[in-house]
Amino acid sequence: PAADLGRVTKGAALGLLSKVYLYMKDYQKAYETSSTMMGMGYDLDPDFNHLFRPAGEFGPESVFEVNCGCSPEFGGSQYAEVQGVRNQFGWGFFTPSPALENAFEPGDIRKELTILREGETTIEGDLIKKGDPQAVDTYSQKVYVPSSLNNNACGYGSIQNLRILRFADILLINAEAANELGNTAAAIANINKVRNR
């Protein structure tokens, strides 16, 4: 129900538990727990660009996210502001590294949907201009909030929810655990679900 948005659900608890099991290298429990969670009605969002926009909050891929908003009394989240384009949408911290940019395969559309660039115009019509000649030229799409949705009373991006766990994470946890258990076919199938969305 809408009243439960932002609350920890059984799916979120199982998803986080499967991640803990994976970190503990208990691959059997990670596989079993993530498999149980995969049968709970979550799905991949077919539009990668939609995932991290405010319109994509609490979508089918959302397993757990922190609900943020603007309150005159308390302000809002600074997550997007800290990482936003310097002197335009934020402070410009935690920017994509060249290593991240080089990790994408040629032609992978996720690269352009992950990295904002100086001089780019977003699909919402915002021109990315850093305003500070010493600032970097790349920024994270994950924290971009269209200027039309900003509330100056709370700071840039104060409404942007924090995505803690997505269904794609669960598929990848399941894939890694399956691979470690020798079930390479299941691992490849789940990796390809994420890659081919």
Q: Predicted segments — roles?
A:
Residues 37, 168-172, 181-197:
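Active/binding-pocket-proximal capping segment
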Residues 102-167:
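Flexible, polar/acidic helix-loop-strand segments at domain edges
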Residues 7-130:
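An aromatic- and glycine-enriched ligand-binding surface/loop that stacks and positions planar moieties
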Residues 25-32, 179-189:
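Structural helix-adjacent loops and short alpha-helical linkers that scaffold large soluble proteins
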Residues 2, 7-9, 159, 166:
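Structural signature of alpha-solenoid helical repeat junctions
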